[in-house]
């Protein structure tokens, strides 16, 4: 039986200054079968080697996109990566079935509290509503989208909050092979 492989694409524009995303990445780095890829470090000029990234995606069963929520979307570094890697003929369109049946897991940190992501909250929309474009992308690429793991209120999170979230993240990735079957 082959080992389930998970690719974690960490998309923080400056991971060294991130308290939350750096800790989350560190928490899952040593899990067997998990590859952590910090794309802002790999591509500081944002000139993505699409062929190399596509090969990594081919070799993994689950793709995790870990990122801070910026202006109701993914950070620019992740958008650029998606634009260059998830191309016609690879991820969608004629012959574009390389990702079909793979699992997509989003791991997101937000600045606002959970209450801000409600119809009556500051942002007026739920996270599920705001994530629809990523859900549409997953659908187009034939990916099976898992329930997102979201840490709300990241700037105000206590050490215990971050440790608990990191433990949930680690547990989630450790359980991925069972969930994917």
Where are these regions (language model features)?
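Glycine-rich phosphate/pyrophosphate-binding loop and the adjoining helix
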Residues: 5, 25, 29, 131-181
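Flexible, glycine-rich phosphate/dinucleotide-binding loops
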Residues: 15-16, 43-45, 113, 157
């Amino acid at each position: 039986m082959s080992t389930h492989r998970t690719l974690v694409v960490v998309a923080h524009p400056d991971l060294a200054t991130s308290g939350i995303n750096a800790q989350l990445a560190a928490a899952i780095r040593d899990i067997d079968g998990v590859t952590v890829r910090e794309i802002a470090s790999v591509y500081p000029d944002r000139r993505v080697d699409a062929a190399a990234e596509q090969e990594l995606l081919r070799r993994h069963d689950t793709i995790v996109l870990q990122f801070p929520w910026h202006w109701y979307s993914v950070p620019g570094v992740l958008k650029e990566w998606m634009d260059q890697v998830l191309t016609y003929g690879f991820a969608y369109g004629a012959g574009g079935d390389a990702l079909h049946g793979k699992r997509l897991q989003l791991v997101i940190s937000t600045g606002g509290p959970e209450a801000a992501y409600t119809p009556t909250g500051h942002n007026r929309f739920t996270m599920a509503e705001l994530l629809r474009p990523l859900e549409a992308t997953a659908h187009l690429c034939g990916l099976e989208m898992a329930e997102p793991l979201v840490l709300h209120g990241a700037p105000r999170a206590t050490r215990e909050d971050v440790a608990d979230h990191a433990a949930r993240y680690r547990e989630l990735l450790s359980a991925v092979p069972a969930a994917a079957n």
